């Protein structure tokens, strides 16, 4: 039995970088994880935090899925109280 490795990436914004840089770093890290044989890649949703760029997991999941081939990508959490449940379900079904 082999161990399946996963990553939970909160898209941190390093000092001196922009949120755009952080999101590009997230996609790059996902590619590297896939190349190293990781099984899953999780992203998180955060709002109003200058040190974290992941405010739209459904958009970020689409970017990561488009940049990788075998990596299973998902959201480690969605702030459901901010959205209509049907809209969340529809957004993730499209992915």
Regions found by a protein language model. Give the residues of each.
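Glycine-rich anion/phosphate-binding loops
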Residues: 21-25, 81-94
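Generic signature of intrinsically disordered, low-complexity segments enriched in small/polar residues
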Residues: 41-45, 86, 95
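The substrate-binding groove and active-site-proximal loops of carbohydrate-active enzymes
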Residues: 74-82
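N-terminal beta1-alpha1-beta2 module of alpha/beta enzyme domains
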Residues: 1-73
């Amino acid at each position: 039995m082999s161990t399946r490795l996963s990553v939970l990436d909160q898209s941190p914004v390093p000092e001196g970088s922009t949120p755009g840089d952080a999101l590009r770093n997230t996609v790059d890290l996902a590619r590297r994880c896939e190349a190293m044989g990781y099984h899953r890649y999780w992203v998180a949703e955060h709002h109003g935090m200058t040190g974290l760029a992941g405010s739209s997991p459904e958009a970020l999941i689409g970017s990561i899925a488009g940049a990788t081939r075998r990596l299973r990508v998902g959201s480690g959490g969605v702030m459901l109280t901010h959205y209509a449940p049907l809209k969340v379900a529809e957004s993730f079904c499209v992915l």
